[in-house]
């Protein structure tokens, strides 16, 4: 199906099949469509609302065209990632949580990008921490295999996305592409915590990942609007495990955490996020640092469970709490900085 035929269909609020969506996405991602056509397609899909078949088709093409990271093994390799767009400007919880996971013995293939609507994306934070981002897929694989953690800078692995960059920027609205990033990890992880900007997306994205072969995934959205587990409100979870999807709410108290306001956790820039994370993963001298530490524990605990490194959410949170207090997570961040610095010298020689 070509994009003109697809536009005729979606204007009539008719869904595309998975294969039809693959056809259109390949045309978009290989530069065969005009910016006007891409913009019209994205807006039409938004107004119609994307079906599960359409998302599966789009994700499969993005994965097919990605510059992939090859790992020695994918057993238990996990990613913790969010769509962004929640408007809260909270510090980089999922990125900080990744280092707790690695310190706990998990293997983490973290996928992320620069901020679009927020104040600090995962790439912005890591750059502020002195971590070199412009790695080849092979170099990222060496980080993950050697240290148990590596960062895949989305723009380096999804170069075909450049064809949609202009229309997305000009539209200035959330589109299909906002939900594709967390679903297109270049290492092909089968274990994830995926935070989304709307509760309505939780079940559909869990079904998408089920169809694409994921093993254990938590798709989450908190009642106070975050694309992650919240200390201040219940969090809705669509969990894919053993090829079955269950849906439930989780209160902080269910996991041994105290409900509390998120006041003091919003940041204005990557440096502020880094300082809060340094405090949270280090000595926690401030009230906000302690609160940030608990937010990290909550989300890292969920990812330990998704990685099958813990038997339950509660067990994951307990393990994350113990690991965070050792200081090993901050050491792991510094290790990654030193490891990538060697690649920077190689790449810039």
Curated annotation (Swiss-Prot):
Cofactor entry: Mg(2+)
Residues annotated to bind 5-phospho-alpha-D-ribose 1-diphosphate: 82, 85-86, 92-95, 110-118, 122
Binding positions for anthranilate 2 per the UniProt entry: 168
EC number: 2.4.2.18
Residue positions binding anthranilate 1: 82, 113
Xref: SUPFAM superfamilies: Nucleoside phosphorylase/phosphoribosyltransferase catalytic domain, Nucleoside phosphorylase/phosphoribosyltransferase N-terminal domain
GO biological process, one term: L-tryptophan biosynthetic process
GO cellular component: cytosol
Pathway terms, separated by semicolons: Amino-acid biosynthesis; L-tryptophan biosynthesis; L-tryptophan from chorismate: step 2/5
Gene Ontology MF terms in the entry: anthranilate phosphoribosyltransferase activity; magnesium ion binding
Residues binding Mg(2+) 1: 94, 228
Entry's cofactor comment: Binds 2 magnesium ions per monomer.
InterPro entries: Anthranilate_Pribosyl_Tfrase, Glycosyl_Trfase_fam3, Glycosyl_Trfase_fam3_N_dom, Glycosyl_Trfase_fam3_N_dom_sf, Nuc_phospho_transferase
Reaction equation(s) it catalyzes: N-(5-phospho-beta-D-ribosyl)anthranilate + diphosphate = 5-phospho-alpha-D-ribose 1-diphosphate + anthranilate
Binding site for Mg(2+) 2: 227-228
Domain of life, source organism: Bacteria
Record keyword Amino-acid biosynthesis present: yes
Keywords annotated in UniProt: Amino-acid biosynthesis, Aromatic amino acid biosynthesis, Glycosyltransferase, Magnesium, Metal-binding, Transferase, Tryptophan biosynthesis
Record-annotated membrane-spanning stretches: none
Record note on quaternary structure: Homodimer.
Record-stated family: Belongs to the anthranilate phosphoribosyltransferase family.
Function: Catalyzes the transfer of the phosphoribosyl group of 5-phosphorylribose-1-pyrophosphate (PRPP) to anthranilate to yield N-(5'-phosphoribosyl)-anthranilate (PRA).
HAMAP family documented for this protein: TrpD (MF_00211)
Name of this protein: Anthranilate phosphoribosyltransferase
Protein encoded by which gene: trpD
């Amino acid at each position: 199906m070509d994009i003109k035929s697809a536009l005729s269909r979606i204007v009539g609020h008719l869904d595309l099949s998975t294969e039809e969506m693959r056809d259109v996405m390949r045309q978009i991602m290989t530069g065969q469509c005009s910016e006007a056509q891409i913009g019209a397609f994205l807006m039409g899909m938004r107004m119609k609302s994307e079906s599960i078949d359409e998302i599966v088709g789009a994700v499969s093409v993005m994965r097919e065209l990605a510059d992939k990271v090859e790992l020695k093994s994918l057993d238990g390799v996990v990613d913790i990632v969010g769509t962004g767009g929640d408007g809260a400007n909270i510090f980089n919880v999922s990125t900080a949580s990744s280092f707790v996971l690695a310190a706990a013995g998990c293997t983490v293939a973290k996928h992320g990008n620069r901020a679009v609507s927020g104040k600090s994306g995962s790439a912005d934070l890591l750059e502020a921490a002195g971590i070199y981002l412009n790695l080849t897929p092979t170099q990222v694989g060496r980080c993950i295999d050697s240290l148990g953690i590596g960062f895949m800078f989305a723009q380096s692995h999804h170069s075909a996305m450049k064809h949609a960059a202009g229309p997305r920027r000009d539209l200035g609205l959330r589109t299909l592409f906002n939900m594709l990033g967390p679903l297109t990890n270049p290492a092909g992880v089968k274990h994830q915590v995926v935070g989304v900007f709307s509760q309505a997306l939780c079940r559909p994205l869990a079904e998408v990942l089920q169809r694409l072969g994921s093993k254990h995934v938590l798709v989450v959205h908190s009642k106070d609007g975050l694309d992650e587990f919240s200390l201040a409100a219940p969090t809705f979870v669509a969990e894919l495990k053993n090829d079955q999807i269950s849906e439930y709410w989780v209160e902080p108290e269910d996991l041994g955490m105290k409900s509390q306001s998120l006041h003091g956790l919003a940041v204005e820039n990557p440096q502020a996020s880094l300082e809060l994370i340094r405090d949270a993963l280090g000595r926690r001298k401030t009230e906000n640092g302690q609160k940030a530490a608990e937010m990290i524990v909550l989300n890292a605990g969920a990812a330990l469970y998704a990685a099958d490194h813990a038997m339950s959410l509660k067990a994951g949170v307990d393990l994350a709490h113990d690991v965070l207090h050792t200081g090993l997570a901050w050491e792991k961040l510094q290790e990654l900085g030193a490891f990538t610095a060697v690649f920077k010298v190689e790449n810039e020689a």
